[in-house]
Amino acid sequence: MMPGSRLDTSVWRLSAAQALAGANTTVVYATGAIIGNVLAPRPAFATVPISVFVIGMASATLPVGALARHHGRHAAFLFGNLCGLIAGLVAALALFISSFWLFCLAMLFGGAYAAVVLTFRFAATECVSEDSRHRALSAVLAGGVAAGVFGPQLVTATMNLWSPHAYMVTYIAASGAAVLSAVVLLGVKFEHRPPVARSGGGRPMATILRQPRFIVAMLCGVVSYTMMNFMMTSAPLAMEFCGISRTDSNYGIELHVIAMYAPSFVTGRLISRFGALNVTLAGLVLIGFAAIVGIGGMTVGHFWGALVLLGAGWNFGFLGASAQVLACHSADEGPRVQAINDFVVFGAMVIGSFISGGLLSALGWSIVSGLILPPLLLAAVGVMWMKWSRQGSIVRALE
């Protein structure tokens, strides 16, 4: 087998694993708030399971980065898939005995699994040459298109298979998907992996974190992901409050997740052609349109339209921000910087997840939608400042 073929195979294995593992996140977001509303001791706690899921993502990010740095990506992948298996089985048990807090514990493991899955995008860049990094990153996230179909359809097909315990079979099936993902990942080869850095190698972390372009990249990642999560967490519960069927709600999440990942087939090329800043800005604008549609009404069409725009905006915003992060560090600094970036992103998401359920109950869907606009404006100002600063630097260099 030729080297190029092996590299392509590794990228597509990561993409297939993304499709299988992505079902974990899709199932959680499609069902977490609904299950929480049934099991929680009070309505304001309905979105706590999803908040705990995000806490799992945030708390696992730095340890996963350290595990990958010291023992290799495959060790991190194995840890993630083990967490996915545990999450599905514990969630099924929680539903069987109707335990809200045990379900929250399952979500903690599910979040840790999701944190590992998000490293697939950076892992793909170690399977290809430098000039193919953006395409590899996009190819892996494109596997989420399959997850966008697989996850919600899995929920719809299994949610009532054991009617006394809705969604129990769903989580058992999700644990099976984690096992299949582990098998697929066994064949991934990191042919362009940088040498392991010595302790203290690379620039001091403070130097990297002080870079204006890194600050803007992290801000855009935080806003894109947190605002998407804030709105998506509330959407299934808001649809239930509006009398929309769970089948239509699942389909809305399916459209959303497809919209999150389908643009990945071209996002890498768009970044190469127009630059990461422009693609990020386009994503922020699309998320803004999602908020406007959400404010505009609470019909099925409004929910679906807002979720599609929200997904596409996340893709451009988050992938553009990820590409900016890649430009802020050397190869041996990568795992540390990427782990810190993801830790900050997920940490911000925790806050959004915790407050979304209470805000939805107290203020309604329209207000929840409108609240995402100010952070989007702040991130857009940061992007425009970077664009103007870069243009000014070019002009000064030519003088």
What positions do the PLM features span?
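Juxtamembrane intracellular "pre-TM" segments in multi-pass secondary transporters
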Residues: 1-8, 190-218, 399
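Hydrophobic core of transmembrane alpha-helices in multi-pass small-molecule transporters
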Residues: 19, 100-115, 302-316
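Intracellular juxtamembrane helix-capping segments at the cytosolic ends
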Residues: 32, 114-128, 316-330
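Helix-to-loop junctions at the C-terminal end of transmembrane segments
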Residues: 60-72, 159, 263-276, 360
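C-terminal ends and interior cores of transmembrane alpha-helices
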Residues: 82-97, 286-298
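Cytoplasmic helix-loop-helix junction between adjacent transmembrane helices
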Residues: 106-143
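Glycine-rich segments within core transmembrane alpha-helices of 12-TM secondary carriers
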Residues: 135-153, 344-352
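C-terminal membrane-cytosol helix-exit motif in multi-pass small-molecule transporters
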Residues: 155-156, 175-195, 382-387
